[in-house]
């Protein structure tokens, strides 16, 4: 089959502070299904996933364990790769932000933005959420806590480099107006428009109170802040600024698939960075909802408390890979939150796989055995309706 063109899809790069949970698996299974479908349609697909390995939280966890940050992430990342292999995730590249190729790419991105006049040194004083690696103002907090994860924030004051995000506010609003499909679903887009319209502050992009990160090329007392580091992975993997033909072939990305808690970084910070660097913007960001347990987002902290129901490895052992994938793709409406429990999963498998599809398969096999000598006969006709259905299936999406 001749290629219909290129298709570049990415998951977020996951933070290896602990083993991944069912929410990460949900996102990755969706991306894998989209990549596989596009390949079946005849597209030349590039599917990227990976890990975001720098930051204060990793350094703190490594110190508590008595190992280096690199040793800490190496152990967790090995488990993530094993999980995706077990799940038969068909990624084309797995990028780690501690790789030399990425360090060079991030420093090149910093310098391009700096030379554009969009980075300056100042002092940050405000509120910081360590788990989210996010800075906030008092007005952005919800009940005095991080608006993304609901955890407490701490006061921070340090010298830092800043990106002139405020310079790109009007361009971002113009992007949402002229290309509403850039961010889906609509609820996420409306949230980001409101966020920009309330007034954007410049973005802190370096830290000087810890050293587990990529050094700022013009000032090695600073490490580059995690979001400038992490977001650049999408072009690092294509060999940006190295002459690699992959970048010319696959960029811009067709879709960044992310959880709703990081839509802001992908739909505001990332396009502003690319505007500063004079690079094309991705075609689309899609923000999926959360999987909820007891009315709360499934999280690593819940997994740490022994709630093994959200551990994908245990779910695979209990139900099988295909059943888990089917459930994740079938049960939830994209963009909306959904309830996850063992009972919900069992009900879906029994209704769909055992009753509907299982009974259909059983009856079909019985008829083939009874009337066709246990051999599937070749099709003898191909009606117009068959052709229409085949065309719809091939061209869907």
How does the language model describe each region?
Residues 136, 153:
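Cys/His-rich microdomains that often coordinate metals
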